């Protein structure tokens, strides 16, 4: 992973090029240094105790329109997005192998070890109209951490690459249903009339994609916990800083600390 300006962190582990075909959408955020060293097990244990409101607010914190909505509006939108993800997962065969589902959808799935020529860590990526890439080095590192840190009891035994692929399948679904699916059709007015500019809320697709992946793979926790786990495989300090940022939402009464 390329470290830039001390502590810049890739804050969304799934790549998605629906917004601009052929280009990676890499969102970076300046992170504070972690306050203290923490074990990966303790961080995972705490993250698993957080309720959906924390994860929805975390997703919103990455959205360019975050400052235009109240907390209540963000949570309401988050609930609707999660419901959208669940509903779309229900339309597919639950419990089926996600790789078989991808094949039935006519997708071209490639599994290189790392991105070619990229300086940032990308874990998975969808390129319109039908190409998905899962970068296996990051999945391998995460699986090794699960084994070495004895996290199976917390995270289960679902392969990390399956969860990555499932999330990208939602973005494929978004593309194919862009005229009807909630995460694509819901827009907000940014300018007052007569100068109209209606914009999509990007984080809704990420919230829905996480819930879609959870339902489709049957994992017992939100895939959002993999943000910290997979970053830990490359940079322990950056992962700990990200954990503390997420935990702060719960500390502000925006979730339960457990």
Tell me what each language-model feature is.
Residues 109, 134, 165-170, 226:
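Generic structural hydrophobic/aromatic packing signal, biased to beta-strands
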Residues 127-145, 156, 177-183, 187-188, ...:
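Conserved binding/catalytic microenvironments
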Residues 70, 95-97, 156, 160, ...:
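Secondary-structure junction/capping motif
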Residues 163-180:
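Active-site recognition of the HExxH zinc-binding catalytic motif
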Residues 92, 126-128, 155-159, 163, ...:
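Alpha-helix initiation and capping sites
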Residues 185-258:
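Metalloprotease/metallohydrolase-associated module, dominated by Zn2+-dependent proteases
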Residues 142-164:
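Short pre-active-site segment immediately N-terminal to the catalytic Zn-binding motif
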Residues 1-137, 141-143, 148-150:
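A metal-dependent hydrolase signature that marks the N-terminal structural subdomain at the beginning
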